[in-house]
Every structure is written in C-alpha cells, then in structure tokens.
A protein has these predicted regions:
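Substrate-binding cleft and catalytic face of glycoside hydrolase catalytic domains
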Residues: 56-200, 228-230
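Noncatalytic carbohydrate-binding groove/subsite architecture in carbohydrate-active enzymes
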Residues: 43-47, 128-129, 133, 165-290
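Exposed aromatic-hydrophobic patches
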Residues: 396-403
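Acidic (Asp/Glu)-rich catalytic clusters
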Residues: 25, 48-57, 92-105, 140-144, ...
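Secretory targeting and sorting signals
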Residues: 2-24
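Aromatic-rich peripheral "rim/lid" segments of glycoside hydrolase catalytic domains that contact
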Residues: 155, 279-373, 384-388, 403-427
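Boundary/entry segment of secreted carbohydrate-active catalytic domains
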Residues: 24-60, 64-66
Length: 427
C-alpha cells in the first residue's frame, strides 16, 4: 500500500513539475561547490577565480568549513570566534572576496576535531552535544553576512559519520547547531540531512534517514539532499528507481513528497550537490561532454519547476586530477573549457512539444536584471535567427513557444556575453 501511495504522490508531483504551477521555485538560486579550486586554484589569483564565477553567473557558493581545521585544539571559550585556539585563516580570504563580489555563501559545517570524539577521525560523532553548537555560534559570529548553513555532509554513510544514526545526528549535531545558529543570528536558515542519494552497504537510505530525523524531532528550515544519478542511463528526469529508497534528481518528486509528509510544507528543499561526470576520462557513470552540457540545462529546469526547491548546487568547477574521482567540472583538470561551462551560464532546455509547437526555457545568468537574448535555429546547415532581440525577465529567465519539430536544433545567443548556449535538440 505504501508503494502504491508513493506512486500516486509521485505522479501528482510529476504533473506539477511539468506544468510549472504557481508553487514552482521561480526564485531558486543556482550555485557551485568546489572547495579545492576556490581555496587553491588554479588560477593562482583568487580574483581570477571570482571572475570565473561571475562569468558563470553563479548566485551562490557552497563551501565546507572543517571544524577540525579551524579548531585543532580545544578553545577555552568555544562560542567566541576570537578565541586563540581558533584559526580561520584558510577560509577568511575567499569568504571575504565572495562577500565583496555579492556572491551568496552557504556554509557546511563538517569534521569533528579529535579532542571532541576521543581521538578518532573527523567522521566520528563528538561526545558532547554542545560542542558543534558552540562552534556553529562562533562561525556565525565570524561571518555575520552568511545566513545559510548545512549541518554535516552525507551523514547517512559511514565515510562522513560514525555511527550513522539519524537519531544521534539529530540530537548531537543538527539540533544543537540549529539552536546556536538561530541564537547567533535569527536570520540564519539551517538545513539538515544533506544525505547521499542512496545508502552504501553499511549506510542508511535517505528515505529512512528523513523518517529517523522526524522521529528524533529534528529542527530545520530546509532539508538538503545530494541528488546525484546512481544508475547508468539516468537523466535529470528519467531512469531513476521509483520503488527504491534512493533519491536522485530523476526521482525528485519522492523527496518533495517525503519532506512534506515528515516536516510539512513550510520546510524548504536544498539540492546541495549535483553533477554528471564526463568521459573521457571518467569511467564511473560518465557521459559525453555534450550530454553533460545538456543535463546541466535539464537539471536547472527541473529544479526551477519543483515546488519548495530553493537551491541547486553544481559540484565542481574544475575536474579533479585523478580520473577515478570526480570529473563533473566545467573545466578539465588541465584547464580546457567544456561545453558545460556555457550550458551553466546560459541553461537552455525543452519544456514540452505538441506537434511542431515547442516550448523552451532558459536563463541568462551573468549580471542582474533583464538581459537581451536571441534564439537561433539550424536550417539547411546554417544557423538562422528566430525573430529579433528580446529581453528576459528581471531574474534572467526566458520562456518561448517556437515552431520546431522533433530533431530541430536550437540555441540561445547572449549579446552581452558574446556566446551561445549549448545546442538543444528538440525531442
């Protein structure tokens, strides 16, 4: 009965996603996370990295502040960011630069110092329920302009939390941090969960984790999920497993329904890590560079249409050097620009098609305010303009109905950026 009910809820949510109803997240922000690239480069110049983010049109950056890095020794006054035991020097420069560039920041707190957990590694739970709360308070005082926070990362897998219990996560980490962050700044918004898309052999599924948090009376403003694809052939809107307990972008309606069921409609949804590895070089669920670019636009549209989704964060700006790890960036590890770079800055996707009438959606992300754009169609081997220059909405979005049959190739031109979107092939 539960599976049938979930299926009914899923179909209802899918209909809402397709229709783009009034509850769609039209105010959604799109961001990136790439801690290593932001902190160390290349390029060596932090200013150049900020310029790259501006060229991409990034609204927000997610960054992990490692508790064990800032507080390798126990502070005498843990709620005071100026306590001599705290060392914020790794994070101060880049966070201040992001603030000066008017790029919002989401801080994720992770990594227990050994003095909090009996000498274990950073993925072991601290023994004192007040410890993370005190650090969270200090972090908020250090960076008062930052008002969005997540507590831990993928605690449902042992790589990031031992023991991976939703009850202990809620009572020892989330709730103390939530109370402390609200005390430090009432404007702070705090997300819990930050779960991986599926359980590992020793882990907990995101569905079971959400329900365990509800039982433990979790305090949260938003539920955060990392909805990576987990199956070959999975796209942002198809190929996911509806009867399984995993949650990916393809099964996003499951997350929407589960969060509503357990925490109510006032709880928002943050999609805090997402991306597709490109191959070559990746061999793990990798897709071609062109398909990666297409999925960037399709994922942006899916999140835009989803109710209560406020954030979609792309994981990596630059591929990791080790091809067996993450290659989901907009640059290769050698610095070559991939098609996904322009696909992120100018996302473009198909909403629907009825005969030759095709509805397309997109966004011009760099800068703020209404942006000029033009559409092109490939005809007889040549790109032809579709009408004249138009303006996006004040938040950069466009939605057009064009005459385009299946197989037609379309793209967006941004005259201010002097570049094209990825090519959209009508399906």
């Amino acid at each position: 009965m539960r599976i049938r009910l979930a299926a009914i809820i899923g179909v209802s949510c899918l209909a809402l996603l397709a229709s783009g109803g009034v509850s769609a997240s039209s105010h959604i922000q799109y961001g990136v996370q790439d801690d290593a690239w932001l902190l160390y480069g290349p390029p060596a110049s932090p200013a150049a990295r900020i310029q790259t983010l501006q060229r991409l049109g990034v609204d927000l950056v997610r960054m992990t502040v490692r508790w064990d890095t800032v507080a390798s020794k126990a502070p005498a006054d843990p709620r005071n960011p100026a306590d001599p035991a705290y060392d914020w020097s790794l994070y101060d420069p880049i966070l201040q630069r992001l603030h000066a560039a008017h790029i919002d920041v989401l801080l994720s707190l992770w990594g227990a110092p050994s003095w909090t957990n009996g000498g274990h590694g950073p993925n072991y739970l601290p023994k004192d329920a007040a410890a993370l709360g005190s650090f969270a308070y200090a972090a908020s005082q250090r960076y008062p302009w930052i008002t969005r926070w997540t507590v831990w990362n993928e605690p449902n897998v042992r790589l990031f939390l031992i023991p991976n219990s939703p009850t202990l996560y809620t009572t020892r980490l989330l709730n103390p941090a939530y109370r402390a962050l609200k005390s430090a700044n009432p404007r702070n918004l705090v997300a819990g969960g930050v779960t991986s898309p599926r359980k590992t052999p020793s882990g907990v599924s995101p569905i079971a984790w959400i329900r365990g948090m509800r039982t433990a009376r979790a305090l949260l403003d938003a539920y955060a999920q990392n909805p990576y694809p987990v199956r070959p052939g999975e796209t942002p809107s198809s190929g996911g497993c509806w009867r399984c307990t995993e949650i990916t972008m393809a099964t996003l309606p499951k997350l929407i329904a589960e969060v509503k069921r357990d925490f109510g409609t006032r709880t928002r949804i943050w999609l805090t890590e997402y991306g597709y590895n490109s191959k070559p070089p990746s061999r793990w669920l990798g897709v071609s560079n062109l398909l990666q670019a297409r999925f960037v636009g399709e994922a942006a549209l899916r999140a835009y249409l989803a109710p209560r989704v406020d954030l979609l964060i792309h994981f990596l700006v630059r591929d990791e050097p080790n091809a067996s790890r993450w290659t989901s960036g907009f640059y290769t590890s050698r610095g070559k620009v991939k098609p996904s770079f322009n696909a992120y800055a100018l996302p473009f996707a198909q909403v629907s098609r009825r005969g030759n009438r095709t509805t397309v959606w997109g966004q011009v992300r760099p800068r703020t305010g209404a942006q000029p754009y033009r559409l092109q169609r490939l005809r007889a081997g040549h790109w032809r303009w579709i009408g004249g220059t138009r303006l996006t909405t004040r938040t950069g979005y466009l939605r057009r109905v064009v005459t385009a049959a299946r197989g037609t190739q379309l793209r967006v031109w941004s005259p201010r950026d002097r570049r094209y979107s990825a090519v959209l092939i009508v399906r």
